[in-house]
Amino acid sequence: MPAKYHVHTEPTPPKHKVIGKYGIVDWREDCSACHNCVKRECAYSVYDSERDRLQGATDYVDYLYECKGCLCCVQSCTKGLLTQEVNPEFEALGDEVWTPDIISSTWFQAETGKIPVSGAGYSGPFMGPGFDAILTDMSEIVRPTRDGIHGREYISTQVEIGRKLLSLPLNPDGSLAEPYPPQVDIPVPILFDAMPWHKPSTKVTAAIHDAAKALGTVALTDDRSNLREWPDSPDVVKLVRQAKSANPDLVAMVRLPLGPESIARALELTEQGVDAIHACADWHGNATDGTHITKAVRALHQAFVERGNRDAVTLVASGGISLAEHVAKTVICGADCVAIDVPLMLALECRLCKNCLEGIACPVGMADIDHDYAVQRIVNLIGAWHSQLLEMMGAMGIREVRRLRGEVGRAMFFEDLERDCFGPVFGKRKA
């Protein structure tokens, strides 16, 4: 049994002003100047040194949106002069997949290394597109929960990347008749992928590589690793064999875009000796035919199972994975591990403005980012994700992430629930 894996996080405040979600509008015209003003009781000290800060006009708007949204001052003001508003700049962040809340949550995790807590309860919605159409089944009754996040019980998140033997051929003396294929062991089922829309600066790339090294995982853009990736092409198998002949310890992975032909191609590559398949969707999690990554990976996993060689190959999935829960849900759909890209940039304070694509200056100056700062922010993010993965697995009663692969019984798919449970009662959904 491998040793317990622990990510060493430490607070790493942002270099630039974070775009806050909430702000308080103060209608001072009718203020009674109470000596015990509710502003003084702010749990987050947002109003400290208010007078000094308001004298400078440069950061006035930033100051307005430092509110954490607890509503304590709004509800307690005796004159009802305080009103909470949503920052329009916050609402403009990202898009329908990389939502402002996801971006803000990623910033928080990269800063603190802690699990984000959104409130005392969740009122919905309980279903949405993509990953939100999957509910993880916390099966406490089926199996007792495990408490791995606090260290009292052991939960393993280690995975092995590489080809596995479906059987062990033995010599008469009991020794292996052929050598065991090379593998790359990583303590957390998360790889670091290349950016989807542009090549980052040398400093950002170096920080990603060193963060991967500190975490014990692999950056797919790092040539120093024994895990090498090739894009799919007609002669990719030839290239893989040439590389493996020069380095027998090399684990070869082929990057295969998800689409209508990906299942047949993945089966073909596996039969020709490829060690791992990197099934990639676009950065919104969609295959070339519009299928979401969860459905595409599930179909690919099932094809391997029906062929009887699922354990012979490692399946890495990437595209649209923006939260820790998406890691668990992708593994449930059949992937061995995932690769992430955009969350790494968000950890470095990226705002998804895409100015870099148009040659416009980055608002956070990412090209000149401090190395140690960037490494620690990425480590903090993975530390928070790792803790959430342990929480989910513990609630499911699963003690290692390898057992979670393809375990669809630990999840509820909304389409199945609608067809089998709600459909017969309420009929076909109209919207």
Predicted feature locations:
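Generic recognition of stable, solvent-exposed alpha-helical segments in well-folded globular domains
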Residues: 37, 72, 203, 207, ...
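Active-site or pore-adjacent capping/gating segments
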Residues: 346-412
